[in-house]
């Protein structure tokens, strides 16, 4: 069989001129604090969109789908693009036929050993009075394009969710598996309070979706929550999210619908542990936050999200695993910063000197927002905040 051309080579087949970063260096007094950099994007920059899917591998940032507006004009799209982090160049990959239909919040991850992407599940818009969820699963590689993966009835049921998925390389093996926790499984009105509106389990994709038997305790079912893999801890981290109203059973945008808990899933023992802290000193209840696992310093970083009253955030916090306390740092940061947003595409990575969070696009609010297609990088030096 002829060896397929690596996906990175496809992306750089027509190399653009190297672009420079548009950024401001932190001053000496700020050198150890995190700082934001706005990225000057080249190539075919995607149109403003939000609530799509993200994946990253070795300098390549992939995005798929999302919504191109807000209610009642929030139509899903099937846009497919890749950003080369080295050349700061976007490439449109929409020329490949047979891929997933237009959708938002699909699970997507990169399979390194196959140089391939997987897209699974997702949803259409809310507030249409219809169940517009998806439960199909697709594979993409540059040699074969898109291929739909056959699934059993049980796998179809587990794929019917809209949430984040993370890729994990199994210890001692050259095999990528993916994990996803909970997520929405309906777009019907008041879905969050319906018995079938949320998935309740942790699932693993390894030649198909399978349920992970985790036992108790376990986090409550939720949607719009971040999920991150901490490789050195061999753990998954979850914070907050949007859930059912356990007090009155009917609330949709009340404080009871938003969570502010922090959980760690040990991939070795397959058990959950809640990381307890004084909520009065933490980020509070929110959904749509983004997380970074700082294994270097024993911290979990959190960026942004949205509150029950519609407030969109751009704050930056870290949780110290040793002291079980939260510290807010954006109030001490200087220089340019992105506007508050949610539903942005993103990835994080570790470099030789820092952790980095890249964000692209998003919406400034759920109702009557501005849709964005700017890109920013948050740099968190290893020496930060010591």
Where are these regions (language model features)?
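Initiator methionine at the very start of the polypeptide chain
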Residues: 1-2, 30
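Cleavable N-terminal signal peptides
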Residues: 16, 26-29
């Amino acid at each position: 069989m002829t060896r397929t051309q690596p996906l990175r080579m496809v992306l750089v087949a027509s190399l653009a001129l190297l672009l420079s970063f548009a950024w401001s260096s932190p001053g000496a007094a700020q050198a150890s604090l995190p700082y934001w950099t706005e990225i000057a994007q080249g190539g075919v920059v995607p149109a403003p969109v939000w609530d799509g899917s993200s994946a990253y591998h070795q300098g390549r940032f992939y995005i798929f789908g999302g919504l191109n507006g807000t209610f009642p004009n929030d139509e899903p799209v099937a846009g497919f693009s890749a950003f080369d982090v080295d050349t700061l160049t976007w490439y449109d990959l929409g020329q490949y036929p047979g891929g997933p239909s237009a959708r938002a919040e699909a699970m997507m991850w990169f399979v390194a050993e196959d140089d391939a992407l997987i897209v699974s599940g997702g949803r259409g818009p809310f507030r249409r009075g219809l169940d517009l969820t998806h439960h199909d699963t697709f594979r993409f590689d540059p040699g074969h394009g898109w291929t739909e993966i056959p699934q059993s009835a049980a796998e179809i049921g587990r794929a019917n969710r809209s949430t984040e998925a993370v890729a994990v390389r199994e210890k001692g093996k050259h095999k990528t598996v993916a994990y996803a926790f909970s997520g929405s499984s309906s777009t019907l009105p008041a879905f969050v309070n319906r018995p079938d509106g949320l998935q309740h389990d942790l699932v693993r994709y390894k030649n198909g979706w399978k349920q992970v038997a985790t036992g108790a305790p376990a986090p409550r079912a939720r949607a719009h929550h971040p999920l991150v893999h901490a490789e050195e801890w061999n753990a998954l981290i979850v914070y907050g999210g949007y859930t059912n109203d356990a007090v009155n059973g009917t609330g949709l945008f009340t404080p009871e619908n938003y969570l502010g808990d922090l959980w760690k899933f040990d991939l070795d023992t397959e058990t959950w542990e809640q990381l307890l802290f004084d909520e009065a000193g933490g980020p509070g209840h929110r959904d749509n936050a983004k997380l970074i696992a700082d294994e270097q310093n024993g911290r979990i970083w959190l960026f942004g999200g949205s509150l029950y009253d519609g407030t969109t955030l751009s704050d930056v916090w870290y949780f110290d695993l040793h002291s079980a306390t939260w510290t807010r740092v954006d109030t001490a940061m200087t220089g340019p910063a992105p506007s508050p947003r949610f539903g942005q595409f993103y990835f994080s990575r570790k470099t030789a000197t820092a952790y980095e969070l890249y964000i692209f696009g998003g919406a400034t609010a759920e109702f009557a927002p501005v849709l964005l297609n700017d890109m920013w990088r948050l740099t968190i030096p290893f020496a930060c905040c010591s």
